[in-house]
Structures are given as structure tokens and as C-alpha cells.
Amino acid sequence: MQTVNDKIVIVVEIFPGAQRPYYIKSQGMVEGTYVRVSGTTRHVEGYMLKELILEGQNRYFDCEICRDMQVSDSDIEKFCKRLKETAIKNTWQESEKAKIKDVTKNILISWGILKEEEGKVYPTNAYALLTGKMPQQPVIQCGIFKGTNRAHFVDRREFEGPIQEQMEAAYQYVLEKINMGMTIRGMYRQDVYELPTDSIRELIANAVAHRSYLEPGNIQVALFGDRLEITSPGMLLNNVTISKMMEGYSKPVSYTHLTLPTTE
């Protein structure tokens, strides 16, 4: 119970149900499903309805079989080899490199990258995304803008291919375009980017990992004179609201700002 304008009111919080989507029975699932967006009630879009159906069945898009793609044992072996090579490449300490184990078909199945049905192995959407062979493979679009809005366009790049390679390319592109300063520590000079590189990488990685791959559209990385904006397609995750985000809610968000430091 709460007091509002000197009146006692009962506040009821209704949590989302598990058997989604909920719809008006007389209109049917396709025509009778609605969502709340920015304080308005709207007819659900096709991609969002697919997401609701998967959620209601406790299924996930990346673990679904990619019916438009076939995979051979040779393809799987090459992919496993690339995964291990990537892990070794991104590990700095030799002692840690020695601990990296081979990736096998069974491991990919346990990760949901491959799926086994009736003794046959199929590629999932995750496999297609990680190999760059997804029908209508999404890309990362990067743009540089002069000032604090999109009125003056300076440069643009679009990165294709496997999503993990897109992520690395977008990260390197941002590093090339932001300013670099320096700091003195003891007797030595150390180069320092104007934005924390770990945060940039984390933001791009979150955009790739948590976007909606059912929604048409691409991740956009926009660098302005005073900030970096990264936007990924999709709605907020279940049980995530703007107010919870402002309170430090720990789940990832679809849109994020990274503000540049200012000097006087």
C-alpha cells in the first residue's frame, strides 16, 4: 500500500506470465496480440510475435535449427579449429594458452551451436551467425559524425562476415577514430584513449550478444564529438524497465551511451 495525494492506494504488480503470447482469443494469435510501447498499445510486429512464441516454449532463436543451411563433418572440424585458434590468439599468457582444449562436435552440441535429431547433426542459427552464413546475415554499421548530432556525416564503415569478426572490426574502427592522449607514470609516458577501451569492447560485445536476431535491422555504432552511441535491434529484456535500469539493474540493455570527458 502507498499514500498518493493523501490517499491510500493499493499497488498491484503483475509479473509476465510464462505461456506467452497472450492474445484476444476472438481475433486469433496473429491479429489479437498487442504490446505496450512508450505508453501506447500497439499491434505486435511479426518478429516480436515469433520471439514471444519462442519464449513461451522456453526456446531460443540461436538454438533453433537453421533450415536453410547444411553442414558436413569437414565444415564442423574446420569451425572447431578456428574457435581454438581464436581462443589462443586472444590469450596473452603462455600458461593460459596451454590450458585451452580442443573444441569438438559434442562440445558444439552441448553449447547449442549444433543440434542432433534422429542421429543427424544440424547447424543452428548460432552456427550460421558464427560462420557468417546466415541468410541475410546482419552487419555492424559504424558512422562518424561531426558535432553532437547526425547532421554532419564524416565517415562510414560496414562490417560483414561472422559476428565475432564483425565485433572485433567495429572495436578496432572505434579505436582508430577516437582521440588518444597521454599520461606520465613515474619516468614513463603511457598512451591513453579518450574512452576506456574495455568499456568500448564490452558495449559492442553486449550489442552483438543481446540483440534480437529476429528483428530486421543492424547494430549501429555512432561516434559523435562528445559521446559514443551503440544501438542494437530489439526490445528490453523481460522484467527490465527504464526505472530499473536507472537503479542499476544488472541485466544488459539494448541501447547505451558512453560520454566523453570534457575539458575546460
Regions found by a protein language model. Give the residues of each.
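Conserved N-terminal catalytic/coupling substructures associated with nucleotide/phosphate chemistry
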Residues: 1-260, 264
